[in-house]
């Protein structure tokens, strides 16, 4: 698009260079982050075969603002690799609003050119560092912040409330649906999130209720920003942002809206019903809007999870890596493991780890309601409803630093993660092995533990 062309003009124009340009989208479509690998493959095959493949179906190419990058730069017909230079060089770029911003250079490997670089050796980390928590914040269910969480635990309360009326957007009025999934004639109770405040001006978001980010993204932004403000980190530092999350299942409602048009068309044809074009569009609009209103661009793009990490990093002008980690209930453990590696190698000064899960959407509830709890669990937990989970939802953030660095910087330290081990095993020995390794790292035994959460 125009912005991409102007960006290339700014970089190459100042060096009086005009590279040939191509895009793998024309062959394989829009693949989000996977497009980077497809682009690399295209470049590598092109280098090997000495042939530059075309970008297809480009009929009216645009050009950059001053015309330095013009339509002539776009390869629209296959051509042999230029022979002005003895060596072949190429580049691939992957970037987009999902947070990807990666650039890689290639040259053709040939024995006559010899080795171009020295052998690279990464420093080996003999022992993973202790991680200090220098900032922390959360919103869980009706508890808005650490103070309310502390008060709830201190008083031994169970924060179970009725499902807020606005959460299911009318689904809770469907008695037949509720009965089918075992809720009787009433919506479920749980540790539901009802509402929270957010500063749209600070987050540079449009305060339009019809075109705003989905709650999953807004909640993560708010909690992460609160935790960072507690810490001593400053804007512009080399800080990584990791968000443990899964795809918001409300996306299925959006997909259902999109698919309704095809389903209605099939149904009309099956019934032999003929409508004018105007009648058809009116019917399609009524039925689709009954499920979900048309999704504006900001709301649509916020279903892309990685934007969460990118927005946090952008807000604080951090220049470390920013991405999401999705591994269901293991997501937080994997994010902490990744943080440990980043801090151990000295790649970043600190790591922000956030986690979010909004189980209160009807899609989440109706799917997970079918998962039974064992009789033993129900017997031992008086807080659980008689035959289902006690659902809760929310988001939390911790800000991590190498303990030695945090101590040297006089950071306020909430707690220290001495050792971390995680595995995907589902049996007792697997859990026991991880626990033993964590204890052995610190030369501790089980008798040294005062609390197991």
Locate each region found by the language model.
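Condensing-enzyme catalytic core of the thiolase-fold
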Residues: 1-453
């Amino acid at each position: 698009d125009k912005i991409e062309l102007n960006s290339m003009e700014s970089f190459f124009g100042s060096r009086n260079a005009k590279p040939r340009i191509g895009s793998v989208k024309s062959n394989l479509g829009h693949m989000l982050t996977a497009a980077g690998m497809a682009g690399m493959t295209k470049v590598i095959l092109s280098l090997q075969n000495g042939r530059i493949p075309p970008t297809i179906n480009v009929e009216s190419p645009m050009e950059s603002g001053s015309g330095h990058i013009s339509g002539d730069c776009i390869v629209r017909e296959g051509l042999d690799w230029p022979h002005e230079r003895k060596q072949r060089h190429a580049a691939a770029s992957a970037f987009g609003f999902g947070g990807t911003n990666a650039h890689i250079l290639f040259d053709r490997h040939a024995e006559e050119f010899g080795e171009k670089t020295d052998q690279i050796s990464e420093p080996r980390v003999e022992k993973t560092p202790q991680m200090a928590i220098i900032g922390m914040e959360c919103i869980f269910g009706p508890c808005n912040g650490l103070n309310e969480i502390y008060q709830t635990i201190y008083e031994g309360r169970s924060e179970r409330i009725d499902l807020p009326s606005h959460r299911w957007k009318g689904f809770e009025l469907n008695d037949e649906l509720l009965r089918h999934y075992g809720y009787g004639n009433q919506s479920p109770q749980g540790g539901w999130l009802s509402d929270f405040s957010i500063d749209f001006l600070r987050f540079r978001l449009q305060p339009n209720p019809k075109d705003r980010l989905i709650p999953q993204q807004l909640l993560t932004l708010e909690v992460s920003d609160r935790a960072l403000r507690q810490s001593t980190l400053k804007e512009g530092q080399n800080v990584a942002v990791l968000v443990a999350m899964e795809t918001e299942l409300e996306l299925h409602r959006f997909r259902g809206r999109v698919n309704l048009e095809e389903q209605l068309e099939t149904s009309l044809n099956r019934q032999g019903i003929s409508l004018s074009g105007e009648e058809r569009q009116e019917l399609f609009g009524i039925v689709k809007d009954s499920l979900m209103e048309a999704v504006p661009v900001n709301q649509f793009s916020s279903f892309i999870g990685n934007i969460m990490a990118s927005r946090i990093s952008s807000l604080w002008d951090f220049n470390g890596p920013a991405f999401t980690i999705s591994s269901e209930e293991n997501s937080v453990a994997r994010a902490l493991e990744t943080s440990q590696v980043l801090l151990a190698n000295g790649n970043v000064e600190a790591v922000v780890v956030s986690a979010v899960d909004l189980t209160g959407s009807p899609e989440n509830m109706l799917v997970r309601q079918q998962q039974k709890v064992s009789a033993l669990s129900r017997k031992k937990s008086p807080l659980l409803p008689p035959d289902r989970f006690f659902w809760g939802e929310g988001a939390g953030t911790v800000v991590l630093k190498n303990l030695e660095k945090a101590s040297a910087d006089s950071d306020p330290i909430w707690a220290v993660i001495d050792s971390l081990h995680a595995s995907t095993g589902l049996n007792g020995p697997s859990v026991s092995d991880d626990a033993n390794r964590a204890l052995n790292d610190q030369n501790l035994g089980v008798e040294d533990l005062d609390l197991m959460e």
